[in-house]
Design a protein with these regions (language model features):
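Accessory alpha-helical/coil subdomains and C-terminal extensions
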Residues: 74-155, 163
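Internal gly/pro-rich beta-alpha loop/helix module
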Residues: 30-101
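Short acidic, glycine-rich surface-loop motifs adjacent to enzyme active sites
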Residues: 1-10, 151-163
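Short, acidic/small-residue loops that bind anionic groups at enzyme active sites
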Residues: 14-45, 51-55, 179-188
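Short, ordered loop/turn segments at secondary-structure junctions
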Residues: 6-7, 32-35, 161-163, 188-193
Length: 235
């Protein structure tokens, strides 16, 4: 299957499909960074490559893939790294799964499953619990956290600095929520690196804030406990 998608949220949608579709068949997301009217539009070649990739038997058992700019990678790790350039989609540390040569996919590795990957069955899910993303900054207080909860959020993702860092006021409020079993996941706004286990809140591990949001919402929809959610993220 090939899914054409706007590039701004392509990585988020592809990740959602990756953790909800449990099938050996490939799902390939593709988009374009340049409009069709550009002198060197990238859309037509990207689409041809994506269709060729989806039809390849070597693409089986690799989960959801993202294909742009003559390269393809796992939706589990790939993110958008630049607002305008055609080589924007990358997995900074994990790397690409392969490239295209004369519109034919060439794989660098045999099929493998990302460490820690979980798949959710959403066949009977009609709506997902509300999870919001809050941006961490200096001198931040807990007001937005409380406002999000009052507005119906069942979980929160903090897009923190560095290793999911937050200030003392926010950390104190998260510690209180920990005791209530309310999940707050601490991600990082850097483009690479893990967020390690936390005393206050849940470290996001390898997941970006947007991917953490999907994962937390899916976990809540299946009734996972706070401890199970923490274990799923790795901390």
């Amino acid at each position: 299957m090939v899914v054409t998608h706007g590039t701004d949220t392509l990585a988020e949608s592809a990740f959602f499909i990756d953790v909800t579709v449990n099938s050996p068949k490939p799902v390939v997301f593709v988009g374009a960074m340049r409009p069709a009217t550009a002198i060197s539009a990238d859309g037509p070649m990207n689409l041809l490559n994506a269709v060729t990739l989806a039809a390849s038997k070597d693409a089986m058992n690799r989960g959801t893939l993202i294909a742009l700019n003559d390269r393809f990678g796992s939706a589990f790790y790939t993110i958008k790294t630049n607002s305008t350039t055609v080589d924007t989609f990358k997995a900074e540390e994990q790397g690409f799964l392969g490239t295209f040569t004369s519109a034919k996919p060439y794989f660098w590795f045999s099929p493998a499953t990302p460490v820690g990957k979980v798949t959710f069955d959403v066949s009977n899910v009609t709506s997902l619990p509300k999870v919001v993303i809050l941006y961490a900054y200096q001198d931040q207080d807990a007001a937005l956290i409380d406002a999000a909860i009052k507005d119906g959020a069942k979980g929160i993702v903090i897009d923190g600095s560095g290793n999911g860092s937050i200030n003392s006021a926010v950390k104190k409020r998260i510690a209180e929520l920990d005791k209530q079993g309310f999940p707050v996941v601490r991600a990082t706004r850097t483009n690479s690196g893990l967020v390690t286990a936390k005393t206050e809140g849940i470290g996001a591990g390898v997941y970006s804030a947007s991917k953490s949001r999907w994962l937390l919402s899916l976990a809540l929809s299946t009734g996972l406990s706070y401890d199970q959610i923490k274990s799923m993220f790795g901390g």
